[in-house]
Regions:
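Short, conserved secondary-structure transition motifs
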Residues: 135-140, 221
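Surface-exposed loop and adjacent secondary-structure segments within mature catalytic domains
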Residues: 15, 143-146
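Cofactor-pocket helix-loop regions in the catalytic cores of large enzyme subunits
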Residues: 1-123, 128, 132, 153-356
């Protein structure tokens, strides 16, 4: 399903060149078609899905044929695809067109419903839910009054502790006394990557301070008050966040292969310097710096000994690792990953044992 006849779109049995921006309408129409097909997988829904009876009315009596006309697709072809999806094994792979297009959150939500009603999650030949080394963030409960929300749009950090970027221009341009006045952008280009780029351009032009660390002078960087050049991914220690290697498990820490220009730092080193100047890092004793030059066991013991007596140590631990171990390794990111490995939960050890690590 792609508006463009891309290289992958030239291969398959079915290519649906959906009209750009109508993905959500197409998915809703497909769900409405499938719930009317006798082959809908109730045997899967009953033991695995909660709240289905509340969800079904959203898709009943929907004019799927008219929707396909808006999507500029052949209804019979979509109908045939839906029939196949209820009778065959299949899996789906959404990518940037879904994630960065219109109604991206709705797209992702309805794709999960589409997969659920066809029973493709966690089954042979369907979609797997891969594991992780550590979560990149934690979902917030918007019902908890202690959950901090954006001041202008009242949005919670629902997705892995992150706020939806689409609300950012409004948060900057509002007259609220606690509105966003300064932004630090790291390795992304909001003025071109996030929804409503015109609103972003207006909002970022009103900021009192815009700082960008990146490997390129992007549109956002050109608007910034300060640009802090980063090392490229060939010049720094980095990890692979999206390995397509299932069922084999890989977590790759890649070593730098190119010498960076003088004074050019990793993004993690830049954040450590900023945190230090802001006074967020407690004073670190000299013997901890010395221990970082020794073996990891010596360093780890000294680190825990100091952390037990320093109240602010645990909260600032990534920066402490960066200033000590990261100084020796010339990589705050690599030092941070060492800390993650040392504090890995039991589930991590269990999974590591499954693939051969003692």
């Amino acid at each position: 399903i792609d508006p463009r006849k891309s290289e992958p779109a030239a291969i398959p049995n079915i290519h649906l060149p959906v009209r750009p921006g109508t993905d959500a309408l197409l998915i809703k129409a497909m769900i409405s078609i499938i719930i009317e097909i006798p082959g809908e997988t109730k045997a899967y829904i009953t033991p695995n899905v909660e709240g289905w009876e509340k969800t079904t009315p959203w898709y009943e009596n929907f004019e799927a044929k008219a929707a396909q006309a808006v999507c500029e697709l052949d209804y019979d072809q979509v109908l045939e695809l839906c029939r196949l999806m209820t009778t065959k094994k299949w899996c789906m792979h959404p990518d940037l067109g879904i994630y960065m297009g219109r109604k991206s959150v709705l797209n992702s939500y309805m794709m999960n419903i589409l997969g659920a009603i066809c029973g493709v999650f966690c089954v042979s030949g369907g979609n797997v839910i891969p594991g992780m080394v550590v979560p990149m963030g934690f979902h917030a409960d918007e019902r908890d009054p202690k959950t901090w929300k954006t001041v202008a749009t009242n949005m919670p950090p629902a997705a892995a502790g992150s706020f939806p970027p689409a609300v950012m221009p409004e948060e900057i341009l509002s007259n609220h006394p606690e509105r966003i006045r300064a932004v630090h952008v790291s390795a992304c280009n909001p003025l071109r990557a996030y929804p409503d780029t015109t609103a972003y351009e207006e909002a970022f032009s009103q900021l009192g301070l815009l700082v960008v660390n990146d490997i390129v002078l992007s549109e956002t960087a050109r608007l910034a008050h300060y640009v802090l050049p980063c090392r490229t991914f060939y010049e720094s220690w980095d990890t692979t966040f999206f390995p397509w290697t299932f069922p084999k498990v890989f977590f790759q820490l890649r070593r730098p292969i190119v010498t960076p220009p003088e004074k050019c730092l990793e993004a993690s080193q830049i954040f450590t310097l900023v945190a230090d100047k802001l006074g967020l890092i407690p004073d670190i004793p000299e013997d901890l710096y010395e221990a970082a030059k020794a073996d990891r066991l010596t360093y780890g013991a000294k680190l825990m000994e100091w952390a037990a007596t320093e109240p602010g140590a645990l909260k600032a631990m990534p920066f402490v690792l960066a200033k000590t171990l990261g100084k020796e390794w010339d990589s705050a990111a690599k030092a941070g990953l060492w800390g993650v490995a040392m504090t890995a939960p039991k589930a991590f050890r269990k999974n590591a044992a499954r693939i051969g690590f003692e």
